[in-house]
Amino acid sequence: MAKLYDRKNALVAADMLNYKVVPWFEEEGIRLLMILTDRGTEYCGNREHHEFQLFLALEDIDHSKTKARHPQSNGICEQFHRTIQDEFYAIAFRKKVYNSIEDLQKDLDQWIDSYNNERTHQGKYCFCKTPIQTFLDTKELAKNKYLDNLQFS
């Protein structure tokens, strides 16, 4: 899932979680327990005055942060950023002139759908499956993790 914005700040980060991420996991019957981000100002700040931190507190989502200036600590995300840059944006902007962010969002949604549902992935997590198939195969583990957390709280 991806959503384009014309700015980068804490409110936008909270909006993405509220309107895309949390509802998607809820539809799958899984509660989002933790999120990993870098230490950008859009993600980190005083909980009482920072929209993203406030959203996490209201939703009871734990927040882990990568090491400062150490993108390798979030390697999967960094690789995805490189892939989307090389395989979507670099090509899309050569093929077409976009008149609106909504037009670009439509093409991005199609690319993301293909990336998640049609394209198999190598690596230690997907084992030559699509990302959605990997998710579906491990969905029960995520549900059990939530139940384990309930028992210990």
Predicted regions mapped to residue ranges:
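Surface-exposed charge patches
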Residues: 23, 54, 58, 113
